[in-house]
UniProtKB/Swiss-Prot annotation:
Name of the featured protein: Vitamin B12 import system permease protein BtuC
Membrane topology (UniProt): Multi-pass membrane protein
Provenance organism: Salmonella paratyphi A (strain AKU_12601)
Gene Ontology cellular-component terms listed: plasma membrane
CDD domains: TM_ABC_iron-siderophores_like (cd06550)
Localization terms from the record: Cell inner membrane
Amino acid sequence: MLTFARQQQRRNVRWLLSLSLLVLLATLLSLCAGEQWIAPGDWLSARGELFVWQIRLPRTLAVLLVGAALALSGAVMQALFENPLAEPGLLGVSNGAGVGLIAAVLLGQGQLAGWALGLCAIAGALIITLILLRFARRHLSTSRLLLAGVALGIICSALMTWAIYFSTSFDLRQLMYWMMGGFGGVDWQQSWLMIALIPVLIWICCQSQPLNMLALGETSARQLGLPLWFWRNLLVVATGWMVGVSVAMAGAIGFIGLVIPHILRLCGLTDHRVLLPGCALAGAIALLLADVVARLALASAELPIGVVTATLGAPVFIWLLLKSAR
């Protein structure tokens, strides 16, 4: 038994080390790739100063953090709602952030600064989160709370569609494109959004024990002495914050939070002590590679990264649906 535990521990360490190495390689590729390939030896040149340090580095850091946040949000939600198909957009938090942005553009008549739009997106996400918490205070079951989140997402999506359809504002048309997901506008001015993600990411990675209990089901978690109402509310707020900041930075990006936790579980990483840091690393890798594809797929334009992740993630999503139906 002790030998098996040691083998499992070594296997988990090998997984995390391998994912860490892949993060470094993907980061290197992201910094080099673009309309002009800039090798590491040229990073200190005048061209490297502009393209690598001022343009590609902040974008790469944002992609790393958003990928980690979305994958962690998916892992948390799947444990929280005991639903293998749960993902960050499911609770309507992503759409809530979009409604906040559209309201800011309409009320500000396109004159608000980028940081103000970011705050409005976070505010929209947190408002949806607070509504969900109000449902949670009524001690609804997890399945009903999940349905409430789906309904809120549909309402927010309808509001966004109505606002954009009847609007003559060019800013709203651009916002619709931005909501497809993309990091084209990220620079060092968005560093405060990156900093806002880091402490929550670290905190989530340290919450393996309550998440392991929640993954056993509500009844088992309650029998093990977990204050279920407290942890459910706290994790919903943390998830809402991560998704809100991610949407403020890059728009709505789907499937990362759904696919990454599933792939790691299929590889045998079921313990949240390993699954959480593994999701953060794998989510960062997947989104970095998708961002490189979005940049290089077209010669004179950039694909929305949400389109890339949806194209790659939709077949996996269908497979998961078919598998769960069996």
